[in-house]
């Protein structure tokens, strides 16, 4: 049996593509464009895993398909290379994070090239390259000029032992840091913020203009969290102080019996009475030790302290005690709520715990037993009595505005983006703070502001980043002699990934972020493929920056990514014992088709789980490429199932894909190729061209491969293979298995040219229709012959053909034919005597 040698074929064609710049982006203005984008990876020390190539293979198939269809294709790759792991490694080993990052990138690039992806490497970007982050910094200066980047004192998660603030995501549920397990305290610190809230409505509205999965759009809508309601102002009794509450249910104001402020609310100290001061101070201290997540947990016991003061309910003049409680966050809404315990579960639990009034204002339910949270007509509500929800809200807003104690208000759950990190390995923020109290952005002519190389990258311990220790970089003097200090915080990893898709369009431009004409030519991105875990943050931040750049006239489109596709996760093979605990693969043995624990002998159940080092079920693509070849890996990952499904890795499936490619190789290299078309494969060939073309376009790669298999099976039944069909088939399989595609194309054509730009095959609609039909001939009700005849033969012609058949003639010899019943396209029934 003939098998192809992937170890010879694959490196040969990879070298050919590199030497000939086969995938250089086309610039012929008369052609349509296609921009296929992968979410670029963080180049970790671990290298690629088999999950990465799934999305990369999908965009690569589309890119190869569109090139063959005559498009200019932009298909680039780069590196999201700033980030904590490199910094941590550098701190642990004393090495420069830049060196570690460069080594990782080289390894990733080697692995990616071994998989045969058609990237235009002339457009490679690296977020840690000063020539790249010059423009990240330039965007920041534009945000600063527009008032969209500002400094604010905000509560952060401070870890004294690490000497830095950490993100909410890095705080464990027990209130300690993910790294090191140290105590985390909430502490106000000067931070850079980006005013993403200024774009909330547009970020919401423009989701209608993009072709994204509805689930991702919903996640963004929920994150933005638009609410329509009213602001209500409450005066504090016997003071000149007041506070504002936002509520989506101003119609329930008659049922508001107490108010709650966040412990951090600016008014707390001013309105706390002397006899409550100690309890309030103690409670504030306790609250600062909890994360926002822990504070707002619905299941937790309600805690709070009375300030000693009362607010006046503006609609009925009643006194409402003012409490502080940690379930109200200073960063959400106004940091104050009016509590309507009869109709809100959390307020009801709080009121029951602290013996506060509960007054029902909606009909229905028994508020002594539980909060009534459904809709009902208004009661105990003065001028709102008898009204439904919508009418009552409108009437109350009208009253609030007429009385000057409130107004209609739209709010968003979205918070401004905390943009600074007390870290070394990130883009320096291009701002100088002068001793006269002013701050200015570094002028464009002095960008990039290069990250200084330093061995001392441990946190400074002062709340500033390690850059505070690099005094010769830090301290500057203006021409007029005024001294200043550079901003020491760096940007988060999100910064470089918020605009990288723009730089691919014009990666070597030293004068501007990218040329306007080129941006006009290539935007928006036609297909963006990546994991659903980036649904909110990365995609929201990129959309925000894009809209700012649109307002500045830099980009010509409102949205960056026209179509988004989330590939599923490739799960590892894992095993569970009877308790449901996962067992590492090196502790499992297979006997007679079942799996057993090596140490206990217990029979185990096979179950898919996320690949992890601890389960020892991570599959390295290098091993797969070595054993089976890159084309096999590509075909297998596309054939596993729908691209958006999460599916378990299977060695058997991999072997099946390799066997299929061997059959393809044998078909083209050992079957006699002829210039004469017998017509036997007309239908299946044209069906295959049609199906593969449509299914690749719809990203249904698994069904496209299934149709290629149908063709191979049909072609193997024939003695010869028509040359045009052989070539067309090789073109169809080439985007999936590009190395094999190139090899077989040369075997058929000896052209010396890559298959990449050979026009995509077309199909003949007329050949999709069956021209022949099989009919049965029955004698005395028994089938005696089956005939293939032209479709739609008349009764007379059908009868003639049937009676002329040798088998039929042998059956009727010497017999009397009483009648012949012919049913076109179905059967002939002969009645004899």
From Swiss-Prot:
Keywords: Aminoacyl-tRNA synthetase, ATP-binding, Cytoplasm, Ligase, Nucleotide-binding, Protein biosynthesis. CDD domains: Anticodon_Ia_Leu_BEm, LeuRS_core. Pfam families: Anticodon_1, tRNA-synt_1, tRNA-synt_1_2, tRNA-synt_1g. It is an enzyme of class 6 (ligase). Its main location: cytoplasm. GO terms for biological process: leucyl-tRNA aminoacylation. GO terms for cellular component: cytosol. The keyword Aminoacyl-tRNA synthetase applies. A motif ('HIGH' region) lies at residues 41-52. It catalyses: tRNA(Leu) + L-leucine + ATP = L-leucyl-tRNA(Leu) + AMP + diphosphate. InterPro entries: aa-tRNA-synth_I_CS (IPR001412), aa-tRNA-synth_Ia (IPR002300), Leu-tRNA-ligase (IPR002302), Leu_tRNA-synth_edit (IPR025709), M/V/L/I-tRNA-synth_anticd-bd (IPR013155), Methionyl/Leucyl_tRNA_Synth (IPR015413), Rossmann-like_a/b/a_fold (IPR014729), tRNAsynth_Ia_anticodon-bd (IPR009080). ATP binds at residue 613. Belongs to the class-I aminoacyl-tRNA synthetase family. PANTHER family: LEUCINE--TRNA LIGASE, MITOCHONDRIAL (PTHR43740:SF2), LEUCYL-TRNA SYNTHETASE (PTHR43740). This is Leucine--tRNA ligase. The lineage of its organism: Bacteria, Bacillati, Bacillota, Bacilli, Lactobacillales. The gene is leuS.
